[in-house]
């Protein structure tokens, strides 16, 4: 399986399966002398951790991260950082009945056809359990970005099903179990999710992630444009079926006079492009949105086939998220951080000496 790494100068390689002994990752390229400890990583891991509310999976994992290498006396050494989290609450017996059939809407069928042998317990390598290590690596990237460049990355759930945030108050995001920025919609979200869980169904979601104070110049045209790399990074998150940068698909109905981000000596007059023009950061906020499908792990019977190709029906047992978008918020933040740090290091390596007579605007 060759697709377990992301990044060039800042590179993250993850390993492990949902019901294996542990999950882990190797982080390469972080500069030396960054003060870091396990507590710095644990904050975001706790935000992603399962079993924290009735609206997410009841799998109880503490997600206690261990730093195995690359840190000495509280500082990064510049060598590879090894991270590991033990799996402690696997219930593999919940999956014994699906050993010889494929869950519709999951990676069971495609993994089986591609590799000829799959770990059916909780989806194995295809499980979102793996994303805990992305969050751990992303926490390192977020700390470096903030301390060295003042970059702040914030994510929130901007839509759950048909319920959209009408106002954005980032101070409210961490004060409710949905990471939702509109306090007036929390009761509606709670009632909706209770009914959804009772029904045994699931729903999709939209997550927005914003990076502020990103310097101008990040991105490597033409194939490694910053927006292309961000789309690749965010699209790699489980259940993501769409990515927008800035206004995204809303640009289809806009006219050029509306969409162009006009400039004045005092700065840009709008940010429809989401902080990226020509594949290069403008210095404005970088804004991305991801669409996550509803999980197919349902207690409502659905049609499928066995590994022998025979027709059958099934329900999914086990513990699952009725809306995977809720816990995707810190994952999206991590993916943005990993990609931005990689491009900052690449830009610094090639273009640190570049100067122009044009003042920077935002």
UniProtKB/Swiss-Prot annotation:
Signal peptide: none
Chemical reaction(s) catalysed: 5-O-(1-carboxyvinyl)-3-phosphoshikimate = chorismate + phosphate
Domain of life: Bacteria
This protein's record includes keyword Amino-acid biosynthesis: yes
PANTHER family reported for this sequence: CHORISMATE SYNTHASE (PTHR21085:SF0)
Quaternary structure annotation from Swiss-Prot or TrEMBL: Homotetramer.
Protein name: Chorismate synthase
Organism annotation: Psychromonas ingrahamii (strain DSM 17664 / CCUG 51855 / 37)
Name of the gene: aroC
């Amino acid at each position: 399986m060759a697709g377990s790494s992301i990044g060039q100068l800042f590179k993250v390689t993850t390993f492990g399966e949902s019901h294996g002994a542990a999950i882990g990752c190797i982080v390469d390229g972080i500069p030396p002398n960054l003060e870091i400890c396990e507590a710095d990583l644990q904050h975001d891991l706790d935000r992603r951790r399962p079993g924290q509310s009735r609206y997410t999976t009841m799998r109880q994992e503490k997600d206690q991260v261990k730093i195995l290498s690359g840190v000495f006396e509280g500082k990064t050494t510049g060598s590879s950082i090894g991270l590991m989290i033990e799996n402690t609450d696997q219930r593999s017996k919940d999956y014994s009945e699906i050993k010889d059939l494929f869950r519709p809407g999951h990676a069971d069928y495609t993994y089986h056809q591609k590799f000829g042998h799959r770990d059916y317990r909780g989806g194995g390598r295809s499980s979102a359990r793996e994303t805990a290590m992305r969050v751990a690596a992303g926490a390192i990237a977020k700390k470096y970005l903030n301390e060295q460049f003042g970059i702040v990355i914030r994510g929130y759930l901007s839509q759950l099903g048909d319920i959209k945030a009408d106002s954005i108050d980032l101070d409210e995001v961490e004060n409710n179990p949905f990471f939702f920025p509109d306090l007036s919609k929390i009761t509606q979200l709670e009632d909706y999710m209770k009914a959804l869980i009772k029904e045994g169904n699931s729903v999709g979601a939209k997550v927005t992630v914003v990076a502020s104070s990103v310097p101008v110049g990040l991105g490597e045209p033409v194939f490694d444009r910053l927006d292309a790399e961000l789309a690749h990074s965010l699209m790699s998150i489980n259940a993501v079926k769409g990515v927008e940068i800035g206004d995204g698909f809303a640009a289809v109905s806009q006219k050029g006079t509306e969409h162009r981000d006009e400039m004045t000596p005092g700065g840009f007059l709008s940010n429809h492009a989401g902080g990226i023009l020509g594949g290069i950061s403008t210095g404005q906020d970088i804004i991305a949105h991801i669409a996550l499908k509803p999980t197919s792990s349902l207690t409502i019977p659905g049609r499928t086939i066995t590994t022998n190709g025979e027709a059958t029906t099934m329900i999914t047992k086990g513990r699952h998220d009725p809306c995977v978008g809720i816990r995707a918020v810190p994952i999206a933040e991590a993916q943005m951080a990993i990609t931005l740090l990689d491009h900052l290091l690449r830009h610094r390596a090639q273009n640190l000496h570049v100067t122009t007579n044009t003042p920077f605007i935002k």
